[in-house]
Amino acid sequence: MWGGGKMAVVSLSPHTAKMRKLFGQASTTMAYDGLKREAERRTRSDHNITMVAKDDELYLYHLTLKKQTNFVHSCIGHFVDLEAGSKREQSQLCVATETHLELYDTADGELKLIAKFQNLFATITSMKSLDLPHSGSRAKASNWPTFLALTSDSGNLSIVQIIMHAGALRLKTLVNQPLTRTTLRRVSPISYMEIDPNGRCIILSSVEQNKLCFLVDYAQKLRISSPLEIIRPHMVTLDMAVVDVNFNNPCFVTLEIDNAATQLSVHLIFYVLELGLNHIVKKADYLVNPSANFVLSLPDLSRYNITTSLSDNNYDADYDTLFNPFVVIGFENHILVKDMNGFFSLKVEIPKRSITNSRHKNVTIISGIVQKLKNDFFVLLQSNHGDLFKLTVSPDTNDRNRPLVQLSYFDTIQNSHQLHIFKNGYLFALSEMNNNFLFQFEKLGVEKNDFSNVLTSKDPNKSLVFEPSIKLQNLSILSQQLNLNPSIKSQIVSDSPLSIATKHFTNNKIITLTNAVNYSNLISTSLPPNATKLWLIPDPATTGDNNTLLFITFPKKTMILQIDNESMEELTPDEATRSAFKLSQDTTIHTCLMGSHSIIQVCTAELRHIVPTGKSRYSNKLTWVPPAGIRIVCATSSKTQLIISLSNYELVYFKIDVSSDSLIELTTHPELDTMPSKVAIVQDTQHADLLAIADNEGMIKIMSLKDQKEDFLTVISLQLVSEKISDMIMVRDSSIGQLNLHVGLENGVYMKFHIGDVDGSFTDIKRRFLGLKPVSLSYLREISVSLNNEEEEEEEEDDDDEKEEEEINSSGAKWMSCVVCHSSSTWVSYTWKNVWTIRQLKDQNMLSCSKFVNADVAINGVCSISSSGRLNIGRVSNFPTLDNWFHVHESSVNKQENGGGDESNEEEEDEMEEEMEMLQISTFRPRTILSFPNNPKSILFIDNHSGKKQCRISLQIDGECLKFGSSDHLYKILDDIDCVSAAIIDFTRQADHLIICAGDKRLLTYKILVNKDKLSFDIELLHQTEIISPIHAMLKFKNFLLTAMGSTIVLYGLGKKQLLRRSVTQTPVSITKIVSMHQWNYERLAVGDIHESVTLFIWDPAGNVFIPYVDDSVKRHVTVLKFLDEATVIGADRYGNAWTLRSPPECEKIMSNHDPSELSNGAIKYPLDVITLQQKLPNTYDCKFKFQLLNHFFVNDIITDFHILDSLSNSDRPGCIYMGLQGTVGCFIPLLSKGNVFMMGNIENIMAEADDTFYLDYESRKKNNNMRKEDDEEESGSVVLQGRHGIEDEIICEGSCSILGRDHQEYRSYYAPVRKVIDGDLCENFLRLSLNEQEFLAKNLKSVQVEDIIQTINEVRTNYM
């Protein structure tokens, strides 16, 4: 399955093999395969392919399932109008990692996600918001949104606008100004960026030597000028800030180190842009303390009645003296407020923690923000300990209103990379290594006259020691954004649905990522046995909005439950009402509500038309009985139509008269040539025009129901699926208006067809293997795809239904219809943003379900019959989409069971504890995550204490943490142990053993004891084993422990008093430190060295030793590796590359024909060229053979784990899931057919060349249309903003499709050329283009339609994962 001919074989479990066999049988006869092969054939003949597929090569498709979360850039502004006529408040927040952007809205006091944007395929180095607040009347600045200015390793300065286009938010590039060469360089001016507060200029700086300044002209057109350069050799920039100077000449300040100086010297330099002279002047240069690391500008102090000159007041000073900006400089243990003219140097010591609360003696400032009030301002500064300090500058009335600096402790939060204060009183803290938080100001700290807690510049050497607050004093948490950076280790909990367990680095919570639709159960009750199907319809006999009738069918029996807002009880008011329904001696096959208040009950022997006669009272208005000996097989209905099929091959068509509420039978009964087994029409419509009919031979017929036309009740199209159909539903997708037919087959395959409204044709055929049981279908309408777990909790807390509905509508909930598929497990099929998705339902297997609405469950309610026969009422949420493929569940091992007490006090304590837990930085850090050899759903977590030699063990089974022994703790503390590595080995079948390598060169062996009845675990120390060096890699090898001590491979067995050495293998001298190992079938061993790439060993049972026989010719700094097959290894290095290596065919031929013992005794006759090379280059050829490089790909994250799965969510192929250090989750999927490789390669090519394609087309249209001469003379990189026009009317700059202008091929080949890996992230960007753009690009693939490309891209997520 991983390529390479006969040698590339992945062993499959019997269950997986059986599923794949059934899937193959089900899919071979489908018409889709023929269409796809034809499309691929046309593609190969009409387009020149750059990727040539060979039988012995491995082609991989890469897809990022969860983007990295190392957020390092943020800015605030009003980027896009979410609602027409909305107030333009600076309440939107844009955050960015190195590769992508996310936009949030904070107006309602929460981080509400607006949009996640495409992968930019570049490394963002800086990002700032560009506002046009003072552009004059001609530019109408109030109509301009906030723009984004970005620099990246593309070497460009990019100005980007967020626009609404085709119903979706997208990035539009306005400027791509070339600055320097690509990639990251010390002298490239892309590391620092500041923008004048009035939007007049953009200042860029490199780490060393170069600075650029661009003037921004926005009087009529948005332009940037040619750059003004500052070149200062040997000067290294530490920090940079722009100064608020109102309408004076723009000014910015830098901290720079002089590399040419003999001693370390740090300079504070003020630069002023002389607008009249178009020149930059170095206005001031001061030598400051070498410990300086931070600079922040202050507002114009003269506006706050503060004297900024040496004269008594500001009016006596000349212009040069009056123009005197101030900055705050951060040093070790103190700060300095200094002005440009050198009049003031106001020093204040930074308050220090007490010794017991501080592990670091020195205190430095890492971030800060200025907040202007109506008549005042203040500054928040954060130290490296996370402490926030409030700094104020006020006029000293005792010293001629000269500036007086005061510094006081404010609060303690996690370390932040950037701080932002919104106008509505919210504080956002961006953290690279922690979660991001949105706070609300409760108060503004201590009073200025509280001198005991305030340090001032009057006493610059005075120090202050304080105790940091355990809980927040001046802030409260409103919302948080989960970050998984860094992610040290992960484990696969389940492959169907895909579930990954990891640990949060700072708060040590267990994070579970699940690719499934979440289901939360609210009510559960038992039912009589053998319940098969249910229907929920509004109760026409009551006036309540949420009163419904629930019909549950059993063999020869029907139960009716009446549900209102407060209760659910069986409907048994009187005998007359009971006689209206058919409750016994027959099976209900269909129930619906037609007209205004008519209930239709269809049983196998009769049809009943029931109407209400009073509150909870009903009467039978009509009973329709088929001819003698004939039974009703199936039925379907819309709001006014009812169709039933009979066992004599006839269809009976009914229509309801809305005025009289009478059911009218059509006298003509169409007769079919085969017995209909299933019929389906659109349920939630007044009149359906098409009827789908399925028989037992797998034939689907489409019959016209257009009663005004000649083809009424005649078959207009056919489709054969060559398998018996178990269920069928017809649904009209409201988002795109398509009519879809959903079909479940007896062999466990689900199919979806697009039905033509006019001719009933079958197109866009999709299918998915769901399980081994026949597929039955249920329909859920008006489901909100945007509902998540947090909104569920808020909804449960809100008792007011109207208020709740308003909140839901204001949150921008999007509605869709979905089909629930019931087989061996339950799946949900839905279409979101024109992308079809089918995912499993988490932790719930249903037999039948229906939409449920109640006062307590306003949206996404589901009433269902579970596979265990219980009636459940719950809610579905967290629908996986392209942007949110996983939903996240957090659980803490720090929680303990609470005893009884006052509920109100407990709630307050819980809220306080929850807030403290959010901000708390755990003293334990995750070290490793282990799965049990025979039970992958059992996960063991090992954490190390950050301050002392101590580790913590916790165990989770099926997502639930077990208690340790008889205690209430969910963990076991091991003292005097610092875990370096660990493994779980089953030396015997009776027990699992935990082996921990401690930092003091000990191997500790524990016996793991699990009590599933009491949900508890324990570990028992058996013995300790002394070792010569710490072990960084260990794994199970047969019934032994395989370890790597430095460069030596040692095999241990279980002894009574210690571990016993069974084998010792000395590796080649080039191997110095083994950091990763993996074995294949207990025969081969792949060893990854920290510098020397991968070496392949084979186990020699006779010599009881491992023999090296293949190594690499390229040095690779391995972080992790895994076997794909016996000859192929996938690995990753610390530079963000992933690669696969394969042993050469001649080597595999020798291995297959010889015993491993012959490798060492010289019995094998190697080829002459191999012997010659080894004699000439003995240092290079430690092994006689070298790996062949199959694939190479840059993922821009350090991969920490690979997980090889035989099948992802019942798919038809294996997959490789990886997790990166920065929180990335991705996968590599093998492409098994040449046609698939060609098609995917073509899609990648047209997307990679889209920048050139669009720009060349724009230039061609510009030339043909004879555009104005003044536009032709515009400078390179400038852009004209002419409002919102169509794609054809827009002015396009180079690199606009890729946003930042980074070449995709160069990006994915950052360290080495990309090889035989297709970038699915780039291919999926095709789905984000408008229809016009898609059609334009598809022209490059002749005879291939846009629908073919979309279907090919979508097939990866639906069928391969």
From Swiss-Prot:
Organism: Saccharomyces cerevisiae (strain ATCC 204508 / S288c) (Baker's yeast)
Coiled coil: none
Recorded family membership: Belongs to the RSE1 family.
Main location: nucleus
InterPro entries the record matches: Beta-prop_RSE1/DDB1/CPSF1_1st, Cleavage/polyA-sp_fac_asu_C, RSE1/DDB1/CFT1/CPSF1, WD40/YVTN_repeat-like_dom_sf
Record flagged with keyword Nucleus: yes
Biased composition (Acidic residues): 789-808, 903-912
Assigned GO CC terms: nucleus; Prp19 complex; spliceosomal complex; U2 snRNP; U2-type prespliceosome; U2-type spliceosomal complex
PANTHER family per record: DNA REPAIR/RNA PROCESSING CPSF FAMILY
Organism domain of life: Eukaryota
Parts of the chain that traverse the membrane: none
Gene: RSE1
Location of region: Disordered: 788-811, 893-912
Entry keyword set: mRNA processing, mRNA splicing, Nucleus, Spliceosome
Protein name, entry field: Pre-mRNA-splicing factor RSE1
Function comment: Involved in G2/M transition. Required for pre-mRNA splicing and endoplasmic reticulum (ER) to Golgi secretion pathway. U2 snRNPs associated protein required for the pre-spliceosome assembly. The involvement in ER to Golgi secretion is probably indirect and due to the splicing of the pre-mRNA coding for SAR1, a small GTP-binding protein required for COPII vesicle formation from the ER.
Compartment(s): Nucleus
Molecular function per GO: U2 snRNA binding
